[in-house]
Design a protein with these regions (language model features):
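Active-site-proximal beta-strand elements of phosphoester/diester hydrolases
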Residues: 126, 171-175
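Short loop/edge segments at beta-strand edges and connector loops
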Residues: 33, 97, 128
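Acyltransferase
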Residues: 180-214
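Histidine-centered divalent metal-coordination motifs
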Residues: 81, 130, 176
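Catalytic beta-strand/loop cores that center a nucleophilic Ser/Cys/Thr
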Residues: 115-167
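Generic structural signal for residues in well-ordered beta-strands
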Residues: 29-31, 95, 145
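Flexible gly/pro-rich beta->alpha loop and the following alpha-helix that scaffold active-site loops
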Residues: 2-8, 13-79, 91, 197
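Cysteine-nucleophile active-site neighborhood
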Residues: 45-119, 123-125, 189-191
């Protein structure tokens, strides 16, 4: 079953790579710029993806309202990087400057195997482009921290890398699944497409190669 995905482009240079991954997996994508889309435009779609982008969640235009709409409509939502931070902030978490600026750097991510992370190894390698991060201690009970960076010092936790809502189909990842250096990017997006209604997407993701921009 092919699903229709609304991709909210937060003026990010890699948004069409994400859309390309989704298309490889069989999804029909409609990419629209943040300032050219309204909450009502989500009608008729099976899921909404909030892309990475510059700035802070408070500057993310329609994205906070889109998260609220997806929650009310029980419409599957995936936030990537900035979109992930918006999800956290909408539910009351604090987003602040990360301890380290990450631009194209990789980290190991440990996770609980739930939601969009199902079937990925733990730890796996993820590529990060961000200077802000969700503060783990402020994440409310509505959300689950499903993935963190592997801490340099055992027992000290790690940077929040993935969130999911306990009851609603809302997910967020801080890292970039579309990066060629991220392990299991196709599988992660396929898991989300399964949430959107395409149960066969995870199986189709096996063996897919990353898209390399030229």
């Amino acid at each position: 079953m092919s699903v229709r995905v609304l991709v909210v482009d937060n003026y990010d240079s890699f948004v069409y790579t994400i859309a390309g991954y989704l298309a490889q997996l069989g999804a029909e994508c409609d990419v629209r710029r943040n300032d050219a889309v309204e909450v009502a435009d989500a009608a008729g779609f099976d899921g909404v993806l909030l892309s990475p982008g510059p700035g802070a969640p408070k500057e993310a235009g329609v994205c906070p309202d889109m998260v609220r709409h997806c929650a009310e409509a029980r419409l599957p939502m995936l936030g990537v990087c900035l979109g992930h931070q918006v999800l956290g902030e909408v539910y009351g978490a604090t987003v602040t400057h990360a301890s380290e600026l990450m631009h194209g750097k990789t980290s190991l991510v440990r996770h609980d195997g739930s939601g969009v992370l199902e079937g990925l190894p733990s730890p796996f390698t993820a590529t990060r482009y961000h200077s802000l991060a969700v503060v783990a201690e402020t994440v409310p009970g509505d959300l689950v921290i499903s993935g963190r960076t592997e801490a340099a010092t055992p027992g000290t936790g790690g940077v929040v890398m993935a969130l999911r809502h306990r009851e609603l189909p809302l997910h967020g990842v801080q890292f970039h699944p579309e990066s060629v250096l991220t392990e299991g990017g196709h599988r992660l997006l396929a898991n989300w497409l399964a949430v959107c209604g395409d149960a066969g997407a995870p199986e189709r993701s096996h063996g897919m190669a990353p898209l390399v921009r030229r």
